[in-house]
Amino acid sequence: MTQIFNHILDHYTYAGVALAIVIVVLFGVQIYYYGIAYRRVHRFRLSQRRKQITSTPPISIIIAVRGENERFLSQELPELLGQQYDHFEVVVVYIGSDLEYYEELQRIRNNYSYMRLTRMGGGERIFITTKQALNVGIKSAQYEALLFTIPGAIPSSKRWVEFVAKGYERGEIVVAPSIARFENNSTKCFIMRMVEFQRLRNAMARAVVDRLYYAPRSNYGFTRRLYNSTRGYNHLGIDIGDNDLYLQDLATASNTAVVLSPHAMVIEERSSVWSEWVEHMRYYGSTFENYNTATKSFIRRERVSRVLFFFAIVVAIAVLPLELKLGAIALALLRYIVVVWSSHLTARRLGERSVALRYWIYDLTGPIVEWIIGSNESNKTPKIWR
């Protein structure tokens, strides 16, 4: 055995053997993510969780609307009010001072007995955060099960509430997918879409094993009992954190239900302008540094191992003997097959489509885009958590 090992070292050198070992280890890390961790999302079934109640509960949908959002009036609110579910209500908290807009909301409210409306003034001197508005919305709601969404998002189905409500049979926190939709299908927009898909995939991969750290802002909920147990949202002066840091305080190993169904999905409109999208991602991603170490490590490890794997493969092709070059190329191809197949299955489960053929573009550029997003703070990022 010693002679064989010495022969290998003499033939390939210590550096060559070390590089080969590094490639194999990094390959193993990548296979763990795409072959095991992310596959859990595709294989997850809510029915595997034990029911805690025997029937779906009444639902209060709560949404905070800031300013004069005409699209909310003409498209989004009718979709919410048109949900096919026996017992639900829509609670709208309007943040603004436009009386005509508020009167239009009142007119709609008068036509729907299951719509509630509250107004919060706000202005240049007094900025009302979303969490402050949601606190008011929760107090106005009449039901125990609360479901949150945002302007700019539309349910994919008239049965959205019905399917999300099934989660409350099995948990007090309910999380469902939300996908980003851009104005066109250019390569730039595909990369942006895949960056958001990867973030959602990471979150769902943790949520299905009871390690919830994030939920889409447009598609999550919890019970009033949990809310009251914390005396409401924390960090009220900060306009972010309600869908991640606050949920991390609420979540336990047994109280989260993940609903993965095309009917439970929500579609969020995104700007196709690069600078606006990057600013959006930076702002809502600025809570990341407050995540626990295990969560941050899970997210970073895939990205770092991917970059190092690519770098090691390039070095191997450049300097190693032919047989090791071929071995490195074979591992790279095998990894990519696993990555694309896993991503295809997970994308279908989360409501994404047309991923496989162009996935190599994101596979190569994704870490660079994430670095660009994380290399600077949003102009609106809060400096102090209070």
Describe the residue ranges of each PLM region.
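Long helical/loop segments within the catalytic core of UDP-sugar-dependent glycosyltransferases
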Residues: 118-129, 133, 137, 143, ...
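Short, acidic, metal-binding catalytic loop of nucleotide-sugar glycosyltransferases
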Residues: 77-87
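Membrane-embedded multi-pass helical conduit in multi-pass membrane proteins
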Residues: 306-382
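N-terminal membrane-anchoring/stem segments of glycan-assembly enzymes
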Residues: 1-53
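Acidic donor-binding/catalytic loop of UDP-sugar-dependent glycosyltransferases
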Residues: 71, 151-166
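Short aromatic/hydrophobic "clamp" motif used to bind/position activated sugar donors
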Residues: 146
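Catalytic donor/gating beta->alpha subdomain of glycosyltransferases that bind UDP-sugars
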Residues: 174-199, 228, 234-298
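A conserved acidic beta->alpha catalytic loop
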Residues: 94-105, 121-122, 153-154
